[in-house]
Amino acid sequence: MRLSSPRINEVVARCRKGEETNVLFLLPPNIELSDFLSPPENYSRIKIRDREFGSVITDIPLGVTSLSGYLKKHFSVDVRAVDFNVVLNCLIDAPADSFEEIFSNAILEKTVGWRPDIIGVSAMFSSAYEGSLDLLRISRQLFNDALIMAGGNLITAMWKEYLDDSPYLDLVCYGEGELPLYELLSSEIATDYLSNSTSWITHDTASKAKDRLKHNFVNDLDELPPVDYDILDLPGYSKNPTVSRFSVPTQSRMDSNERVEALIENSEKLLESIPPIPIMTSRGCPFKCTFCASHAAHGRDMRYFSVQRVRTDLQRLVTKYGCSHVVVQDDHFMGGKRRPYEVVGAMKDLNIGMFFQNALAMYALDREFLRLLKSSNVDELVLPIESGSMRVLRDLMRKPLKTSIIARVVKDCRQIGIYTDANIIVGMPGETRQDIEESRAFLKTVFADWFRIYVATPLPGSEMHQLAIDLDAYVLPPYRAHYKRAVIKTQDLSPDDIEFYTYLMNLELNFVFNSNLRLGLYDVAIKGFELVLSVKNDHPFAYLGIGIAQASMSKFDQANIHFDKAVEIFFASYSYWAPFLDELKIDIENFNAEKFMSWLRGRWALVPSESEEIIESVEVG
């Protein structure tokens, strides 16, 4: 089922000699088939011909686009790509009960009159595991003489599992692929090179690979050619990018004696002919957070593009693609004392909007840098708070962050006029109910605009993953992990407990104790709830939140409409919502708006607050 050694040598020799070589990159969907066909209650959805399916994020991939640029620089290659995250979002007809027909049809459509010599499957997330195995099998069925390889963050960490589970796979790349691909395709006899390579694993070398594998990085990133976005269907990535889940607000400037109001626009309105384009200005991250696996692919030592190279690439995005917004995906953008200022300055000079998807190290976010971001039209930041428990941060996550820094940065952002999305992780190995209660209590005192609460996901390649193996904590296979589905247990918490607390904290922090509601910024709060309803139109807590805001503005008729809608949805799915309502002590059996509002204000009053100071000290631009 795999290629013979002579055929591998033949494919590589043709490329080495400068003959035209066809390369096809395939990206599996970052969603399991079961979650796509039957999305759980708390998943966002897409609709195809009146049937709901699990929502699939369409983020432009940087791995295969960088590899394409590098291959085109050194070899005579024709590169094509099929991203099945885009394919699923562009479906016109509802799919059958498998991905197979979708995969086959999309590949055949992309390869009409063209046959790939090399097929590369790239996977980043655990949820892509089963889909990537399907693509390897289908690729061999369609193109039995192609050299089939696989790589990416997930495959680097799970290379043994891929070789065990896929007899169709010829070789696996370990870590970043630019230099390994160059060395392979330049080798005199490919099979001899592979037998001794520290960057590639085959079925024949797997037994001795563990002891000799090592990264083979391009150390001077300026040597890399520009990322080749041309192999992608760029407009297709406008369908459902991660950035559309964030509010991307603009902040109104007002008198210091007036309350600050924000106008939050759904970022989809910002998506023009192409979506915001991702960039990386560096690779690597020196920190050792136990839940992170990026070092498995990119290492811990920092490598940077020069600021001048970043400027050149940004200008190219503007000139060639009409780019107006970028998504910065560096794992550690804040590396270097002045470099972050210079890179942001380059984007500001070109009037490019920027969104920091992977968040920014909070210790480095002083007021000077935050003001620079605000003056550069950055109106929203993702903050990697991760937990409100000092023990969890220090001992379980090994994250260099103190709760005092969290409070200071969130307060500074609000005063400067930057909307904040706080990332929170629940269910780390060793985390207890007491830790979660401590986190809940602290986070209520932090006036972030929105909290994004995720199930702790043991990414293959992370220390957390290895710890879960050592503790025999896995209840489901690692590849079943999802930011809304727990696959491990802790000594104190079952997977169901972890999922319950994750969603409970979402409901509590974003709706019942919504920061903007408590600060009296009702229009801001309503826009946030409306964004939720645009993703899930039957979310009762979003209707409840709008009702709270309207009642607080004495718009009682409108408030009652939304309260009634919330109660209706609660009762329609009572078995699902009842545990959360009980924990939050919300009585819907005999719901009375006036009594509810009085009770809620009493709950708010119990939380330590600096709301007046926060409001009154907003900076005026």
Regions found by a protein language model. Give the residues of each.
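C-terminal accessory regions of radical SAM enzymes
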Residues: 2, 6, 20-35, 44-55, ...
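Acidic, low-complexity intrinsically disordered segments
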Residues: 2-311, 318-322
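Short amphipathic alpha-helices and their capping/turn segments at secondary-structure boundaries
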Residues: 7-19, 66, 365-377, 440, ...
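Conserved beta-strand positions
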Residues: 25, 121, 150, 174, ...
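Radical SAM [4Fe-4S] cluster-binding motif and immediate context
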Residues: 59, 229-421, 426-428, 432-441
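Short acidic, glycine/proline-enriched helix-loop-strand junctions
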Residues: 146, 352-353, 397, 401-405, ...
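Structural recognition of alpha->loop->beta junctions
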Residues: 162-180, 370-381, 438-453
